[in-house]
Amino acid sequence: IIQQVDTPQNLYDKPCNVFVAGFMGSPQMNLINAKVVQSGEDVVLMFGGNTVKLPEGKAQKLIEAGYVDTTVIMGIRPEDLNDSEVIINANPDCVIEATIRVYELLGAEVFLYFDIDEVNCTARVNPRTTARPGDTIKLGIDMTKLHIFDKDTEQVILH
């Protein structure tokens, strides 16, 4: 069954469903169940003891589509997680904590492997990172690159 027909870049950047999101890219997109919660004017995603604030446009789309107080699938590519202190300090509402299981140096980049709610996740970071297995670190999420999928249908809600 053909899931999506598009250019390779659009398949990677704008997958239509969880299957395409997980299939395109290596390492694959991190796909994590998250609860959508409205807190005053803000909408946040809660998962694995972490809470991240959604940008206003994405928050409004979830409110309008009726996803507040439901569980969705949050998708974030490994390269859209960053352990740079500059990025973390600039976006404190979009930071998660993770305990590193595996550190894999690949020359020009490092893959950090960690778990969130028993889901294996990966961050692709700068090779100068000081993170090592056993360390609990902060990772900033590029919320402009966040994907959200319906938990039941696995179809994209927003990119």
Spans of model-derived segments:
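Short, acidic/hydrophobic/Gly-rich beta-strand patch recurrent on exposed beta strands
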Residues: 44-48, 75, 111-117, 124
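Residue-level detector of high-confidence beta-strand sites
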Residues: 4-5, 103, 159
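Internal alpha/beta loop-helix hairpins
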Residues: 1-51
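Short, conserved beta-turn/loop elements at beta-strand boundaries and strand-helix junctions
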Residues: 38-42, 103-110, 151
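Short beta-strand segments
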Residues: 32, 50-53, 96, 119-123
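Glycine/charge-rich catalytic "coupling/switch" loops of P-loop NTPases
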Residues: 13, 42-100, 130-159
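Short beta-alpha junctions and helix-cap segments that line functional grooves
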Residues: 7-8, 19, 84-86, 125-126
